[in-house]
Amino acid sequence: METNVPEKKILGFPEEMNSTIQFLSVEKTTCRLPVSIKFNIPKKISTKRRRISVEEEEEEEDENKTKLSSWEKVLSSDEILRLREVSRRKYLTDRENKKVEELRDERKDDDDVEGYRFPDAYDQEGCIDQKKRFDVAKERYCERRRSGRVVTEQEAWEDHQAQKARVRFGAKDKKQVVDGYEFVFDDLTGFVEESSEAETGKHRGCYSKTAAEKAREGREFLPIHGYREELLKLIEENQVLVIVGETGSGKTTQIPQYLQEAGYTKRGKIGCTQPRRVAAMSVASRVAQEVGVKLGHEVGYSIRFEDCTSEKTVIKYMTDGMLLRELLIEPKLDSYSVIIIDEAHERTLSTDILFALVKDVAKVRPDLRLIISSATLEAKKFSEYFDSARIYLIPGRRYPVEKLFRKCPEPDYLETVIRTVVQIHQTEAIGDILVFLTGQEEIETVETNLKRRMMDLGTKGSEIIICPIYSNLPTPLQAKVFEPAPKGTRKVVLATNIAETSLTIDGVKYVIDPGYCKINSYNPRTGMESLLVTPISKASAAQRAGRSGRTGPGKCFRLYNIKDLEPTTIPEIQRANLASVVLTLKSLGIQDVFNFDFMDPPPENALLKALELLYALGALDEIGEITKVGERMVEFPVDPMLSKMIVGSEKYKCSKEIITIAAMLSVGNSVFYRPKNQQVFADKARMDFYEDTENVGDHIALLRVYNSWKEENYSTQWCCEKFIQSKSMKRARDIRDQLLGLLNKIGVELTSNPNDLDAIKKAILAGFFPHSAKLQKNGSYRRVKEPQTVYVHPNSGLFGASPSKWLVYHELVLTTKEYMRHTTEMKPEWLIEIAPHYYKLKDIEDTRPKKTQRRIEEASTSKVDTNKKTRTSKVDTNKKSKR
């Protein structure tokens, strides 16, 4: 244990000298003065001493002259001469002694600057060589280690710090040599030098437990630990088991380990699905740490475009979409002994498809164990779907939560959120606050306004630390939500609904729930997806309230009346684009998708729209069976239109450029970012990728971004300068690498044609020809095949530029208007050339010059003639084969 001594003025020292004295720590158990004192003495002190000596000499000479003048009156001349001689000799002797003293002081001053004073024993022993000093210190360090006593990490750190401030050689029981100075101490705290990681690492390794050991010990304190034996018995007796356990009970991390310890991995792997890729990665990392193995060996994960597993892997975490893709290769899941579908209450699109598929697999594989894990009490529905499966409830670690309601909804709930945060901060006990908001825009708005409100309050209250968390936030900033707030402050976490179940933030005592979330909704009639702000369900409200009762009693402030909410959220399968689902089912040999065993059947018009789109893309034939093109498309873990674009690039000799564009589109809209205080510079940097003789469009601009980044050797600094998110670019590179490998797998020739922009645009159109629009007189656009008015998205490089007459777009989104996102200019005759089965001349007729019309007609005629010749040749071939 060490007691640190603060800075304190030393009596008799000049002011400038006092300001530089520092003291290192000293052991509390002894009454000795500090054994090692470090201080700095300015060089001008020696000059000041010399000046004082000269003044003393002058005063002494004046005094002597006065005395001589008085004595001259009474003494004879001989006596005066003799006395003068004696006085002169005495004066010279004293002066010589003073000079020697001054020189000694000057040398002492030089030695004391930036130096240390050793104890008397060191001076008496003489100079001890460097090796001997370190040997003495090392012996003292190893002495405690040999004693066999277990030392905690904190004690090891304290001992190491004390050793740095303690005398390591010479006699420790002697007072330090400091001539002529008196020190005054008080009880305040001083400072010791900060340890570097390299210095303290070895001590930490010797004295403290590893992170893996701590993680293993923490397993015993989870709520699920007491139910281990009972749980294993139920899994052995029941092929299908529905487990209900609150978030934080340990079901996700512990059940796979219990099964491994019980010997289930001898018959195959244990697979556990997660609805989000971030959850799959973080949980796998935690379990690998608890098991004590390297991530990717015995414990691994698999997410889209990333596989961190090996032949040794026996516990595998994955997204539900990845297990769905494994079913394409291994329909009976023969390599698995247990399948755990975790977070089943979220009812994602892939989860609902998995329910039906694993239900069928369990019927043909009696040895397979199927566990459905949920954090809500919707277990009865799961049990009924799986033929009255057994339900097992694991109690959570919950404290009482006081719920406060608003009688009527607030018109401006963001302002109410800010007022509630300030109210809690000023009136409630210490504890962190968790606020649920719908997305990044709302989080940034509340963060800005809350900071302004706290500045207006000034020093009336303690400080708050605002920690936002959303998907596009850089990882280091996301990690701040898990750091405890400094003493005397309060942390305010602004989060999306990811904090409902996927994240556990300790220290939260208050929850503010406005009662809204964003859900993705697809309109099959228009083919448009919209991210809508909608009220949450009662199940979600219960999850949010539970976040405040994990470490102690909490409060939940609800800005709504819970009676107005629906019991559960609408499953994603009833509000999503089903094209990829139908293509997957067709590739599995399931022809009748309308009578498929869905837990909640999707709308029929959504299934019809998906079948029509797949037929237009060439993935299905006239009777609804998958084609060779469809078999190649299903190999790519992307949207069917995107996969058709990749497959179609082979014809236009630009497959390398197209997979780059596909990878950039797959990372979403998180490539560019616009800081609030640098929006003009960010927009200018983004438009640099569009500059050309003509505006190239968003797809080509994304290609240029990736190629420029590659030329800069994948530089993070370059991304910062261009206002590009390096995290998104690295993910795009990983996606591109996997797409490149899949191209080789399906036998597509790798070609490059970077200078032929028309060829690249045609390849894009090969997959996205249903997404075409033409310019109207009022500046808006009209979809070619649908009577719908759409607009260029403000984030597009074509927004505000000279309008192009014809565009192809990546997707439609509904915000304030129906916007086309990621647009590129095209020529109308390409529609007839690429998709004559989908477009007719009347679809693209307008007031164009006759030459353009003639080119379109010629392209259409030549395409029809080619198709006729192809059909005729096929008929002739069939006749010859029959003969």
Swiss-Prot record:
Keyword Nucleotide-binding listed? The answer is: yes
Keywords from UniProt, A to Z, are: ATP-binding, Helicase, Hydrolase, mRNA processing, mRNA splicing, Nucleotide-binding, Spliceosome
Where is each Helicase C-terminal domain found?
Answer: 416-589
Q: Which GO terms describe its molecular function?
A: ATP binding; ATP hydrolysis activity; helicase activity; RNA binding; RNA helicase activity
Write down a Pfam family by its short name: HA2_N
What stretch of residues is annotated with the motif DEAH box?
A: 342-345
Q: What transmembrane ranges does the database entry give?
A: none
Reaction equations catalysed: ATP + H2O = ADP + phosphate + H(+)
Question: Which amino acids does the record list as binding ATP?
Answer: 245-252
EC number in record: 3.6.4.13
Q: Which InterPro entries match?
A: DEAD-box_helicase_OB_fold (IPR011709), DEAD/DEAH_box_helicase_dom (IPR011545), DNA/RNA_helicase_DEAH_CS (IPR002464), HA2_WH (IPR048333), Helicase-assoc_dom (IPR007502), Helicase_ATP-bd (IPR014001), Helicase_C-like (IPR001650), P-loop_NTPase (IPR027417)
Broad enzyme group:
hydrolase
GO BP of this protein: mRNA processing; RNA splicing
What CDD domains does this protein map onto?
A: SF2_C_RHA
Q: Where is this region: Disordered?
A: 845-883
Q: Which family does it belong to?
A: Belongs to the DEAD box helicase family. DEAH subfamily. PRP2 sub-subfamily.
Q: What is this protein called?
A: Probable pre-mRNA-splicing factor ATP-dependent RNA helicase DEAH8
The species is Arabidopsis thaliana (Mouse-ear cress)
